């Protein structure tokens, strides 16, 4: 059923109809459209368009339709309706007859779809926040069990300084906490109802839009009708949040792909999140992580596409805005799936402590400790930096770690070096000395785990 047509003397070309129709993707707004319609029916009672009995009949029919949709949302796709609004109205008319045709009084599809999409966004943000916190909790739990797993930290993908696997986990907790904060901020901004703004100039009926917003669970009503039907900032903001969140998950995936490689061999992924090769029997591929990394690109693309769609649009509604949904639906679905998959990857991961410690001992990751030792002995840091660089060259030439160089060799570079240098160069000392807030010392890591648990409880 089309919601327009009186103005036209020819039927739409079937090719145009297929091009124009949006039911194949906006069917996902069915529940929100029905909920919005129930609220609108109540508003129409307050302005005398519907009697209380008529409203009750409409609400009962809409609630039946809502249950039918929840039981089988795919049924909607069998229809040739133009969009979800016409499908809901058609089904309502089937149930209550001519009374169903009164529901759209004073309402436009412009404010209707804007409301539906905001309601869907609110529901989806709640799901994303839950999945985000589940992953944070999984990371904290993994950190709790791996506080003593010493491994190399990297800059430029070169071994830099020793850290722990727990500290690595907590770095991603911080990223996810920022993602959580961004989603909460976005939720505040989209929590305003555009319903009652009509096509662009507002409704001709003196509906209490604040009351209407409250019925729908919004914090308030929007302030300007022209902006309300044109606004897709919430789409852009959620796509931006998703893009940033997926960058974090992609980096998480890349780190673990490397840690899982034969070259690093720091972790073993569970069989439940890996796959094999059709040719090479020995392969165990980190497909879950590679897909997380790969899916990041499609989310970034959705943000870029939406930016380009909106950048040249005049006020108010334009059909271009129909393009807001597919990218948003796909991006947020993808983000949600990747959050769940990242959590699953952590469930069953095995950290190979001996191999991690062996790698941390290599690469002269304790060189900074030797420089700090010299500074404590009164050597200016820049000079100490140069001295240690020369000592590293000597250690490489001898094929030894710094801590294995004889004292006489170390003293060739600085006479202030004494026997007390060797405890300083141990892995544990390297960790213990990083005791400022946010550092990798066991005390700081334990405190960070405790703080994260308290925040997530």
Swiss-Prot record:
It catalyses: 2-(N(omega)-L-arginino)succinate = fumarate + L-arginine. SUPFAM superfamilies: L-aspartase-like (SSF48557). InterPro entries: Arg_succ_lyase_C, Argininosuccinate_lyase, Fumarase/histidase_N, Fumarate_lyase_CS, Fumarate_lyase_fam, Fumarate_lyase_N, L-Aspartase-like. One of its GO terms (cellular component) is cytosol. GO terms for molecular function: argininosuccinate lyase activity. CDD domains: Argininosuccinate_lyase. Its main location: cytoplasm. It is an enzyme of class 4 (lyase). Belongs to the lyase 1 family. Argininosuccinate lyase subfamily. This is Argininosuccinate lyase. It comes from Klebsiella pneumoniae (strain 342).
